[in-house]
Amino acid sequence: GDVYKRQIMNCMKGACCTLLSLLFSLTVSSGCKEKDMSMKMNEPHNIKGVISYKRSFGDLNDTHLSVAKKIGIRPLASRSEAEGLGGKLVQIKPCERYAMDSLTHSIPFLIPQASALLDTIGANFLDSLSCKGLNPNQIIVTSVLRTADDVKRLRRRNGNASANSAHAFGTTFDVSYRRFCKVEDPDGRPMQDVSPDTLKLVLAEVLRDLRKSDKCYIKYELKQGCFHITAR
């Protein structure tokens, strides 16, 4: 009788183990749905842009200069001077909100107000792309604070480079409208590209709204392929 009881107990234990392992595997498989690795397509909607870039972003150099002189730092002779300005300047670095060119004729410093404006533009642009069904892209900062040394070097390459520029006051930065930085999916899911023309339309909407709410002055730079932006 005892042998028979032991056999039944062993059978029941085995059945329980099988049932438990089956339940475990079902739970795990339902919790770990395979990630969709098909290409993430754009589903664009509600992209309007602005009627005219020149008219929408026509703030002239004098307007930029006037506010830059009021709220900015005094122009610097060299890069080493920027390091010593402590709380007056914020060093900007590529982050989740924006990408940066390797700056050859400027240095990555802005007054806190302009740094905050750049953060807002980058964040609003990403939000706007998401709302309009477009895959994420970052804006690219192409020029920031220029010292007297930077202007001298820039003039050798571009005779029109003005020594009298808002870039000298730490209030002003340029953002490309021709190039953007595609944000790749962290898990490697392929993402459909968004054309630079479409991205330019969305960026123009973001900038128009910030300009209308008196956050900045903006000049559309046709030759340089950028928006020239000064904090207010």
Which residues does each PLM region occupy?
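Bacterial N-terminal signal peptides
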Residues: 18-27
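Acidic helix-start/capping segments at beta-turn-to-alpha-helix junctions
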Residues: 134-151
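Charged, often glycine-rich, active-site loop that binds/positions anionic groups
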Residues: 148-163
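Second-shell loop/turn segments in exported
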Residues: 100-112, 139-141, 185-197, 230-231
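Stable alpha-helical elements in mature extracytoplasmic
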Residues: 110-117, 121, 135, 150, ...
